[in-house]
Amino acid sequence: MSRIELHNCDCLPFMKQCSDKQFDLAIVDPPYGIGKDKKFIKKCMTKQKNGKRLFTKCNNFSIKEWDEIPSQEYFTELFRISKNQIIWGGNYFVEHLKNSSCWIVWDKCNVGTMQSDCELAWTSFKTAVRKYEFMWSGMCQGSESNGKIMEGNKKLNEKRIHPTQKPVALYKWLLHNYAKEGDKIIDTHLGSGSIALACEEYGFDLTACEIDKEYFEAASKRLSDYRVQM
């Protein structure tokens, strides 16, 4: 049975209390100032097969004071306490990262929309670049059986509770491909808590920090609700 520890705290002081290489794998999604110079788009546009454009409502999220790129000290501590790392948005932090042969490309299958086609993750692994396909555009989300195909039953869609929320299926894929049985995982920016659900289902121990009380409580509730459904 997995052990999930969620902490409502600033991750930097927390990491300073951790031992060297205490965690086998860090899977993190640090902020990179997405709301600093622009407002979040209120509607998501998806191009349909017939060529028409479909506008779907997206959740609106307030800009938070903590939404800033982490310092060098953050990355120094992250590398100290973990043996391997997967860092989402690594393309925004290149000045803090070494060259890597193994980037992860998440194809969100939303070509023709106003959103980014892909998101990138830097990794410390010595393998080739890998791509994962899972639709993620407003109300258009991939199905559990085939991430490239839109889920027909909208009741099965994940509720958006965070502006940079990523699907649980993506974290399951990461754990399946990059974590080993018995690995201890750390996430410094829990956000929506998707990683907690994936670790719970796959049996990985997780330690996670979330500085924002609103998101921490929402992610904690999401995990509790998920456990009831399992």
Regions found by a protein language model. Give the residues of each.
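Extreme N-terminal starter segment of soluble prokaryotic enzymes
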Residues: 2-6
